[in-house]
């Protein structure tokens, strides 16, 4: 991680309001797993959950704490599309492939909604949109 990124994390709302966690020992010895997921941000947690639900024995490793990096620095918005916009996708692939890539972001939001319902997560989800 770059020093600039570390400062962003230490000055984030997430860091300022997160409850202190008890120290956990580093992983010692050997463990057995079908899959090891490294990083417990939204992507890593999602991958680990999906794999575990499919019957795999999963080990999830995180250096800091859950959602410590980019997942903890956002303002809580889950928005369709990509930060770079659609143009790079349209240049790199066919229009059908670019549309499929965009549709993956819609499916991602649908999956988040489903998991919120499935696990009864109290997160004050509000559907909306942003324009700038």
Regions picked out by a protein language model, each given a short descriptive name:
Residues 1-35, 53:
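Extreme N-terminal leader/targeting segments of oxidoreductases
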Residues 30-60:
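N-terminal Rossmann-like FAD-binding beta1-loop-alpha1 element of flavoenzymes
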Residues 70-72:
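Conserved catalytic-core motifs of eukaryotic protein kinase domains, centered on the activation segment
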Residues 75-80:
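Short, hinge-like loop/turn segments at secondary-structure boundaries
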């Amino acid at each position: 991680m770059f020093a600039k990124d570390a400062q962003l994390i230490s000055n984030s709302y997430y860091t300022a309001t997160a409850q202190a966690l008890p120290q956990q020992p580093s992983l010692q010895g050997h463990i057995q797993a079908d899959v090891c997921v490294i990083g417990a941000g939204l992507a890593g947690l999602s991958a680990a959950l999906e794999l575990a639900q499919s019957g795999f024995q999963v080990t999830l490793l995180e250096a800091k704490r859950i959602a410590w990096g980019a997942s903890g620095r956002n303002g809580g918005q889950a928005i369709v599309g990509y930060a770079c916009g659609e143009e790079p996708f349209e240049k790199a692939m066919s229009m059908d492939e670019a549309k499929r890539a965009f549709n993956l972001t819609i499916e991602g939001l649908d999956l988040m909604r489903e998991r919120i319902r499935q696990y009864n997560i109290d997160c004050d989800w509000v559907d909306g949109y942003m324009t700038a």
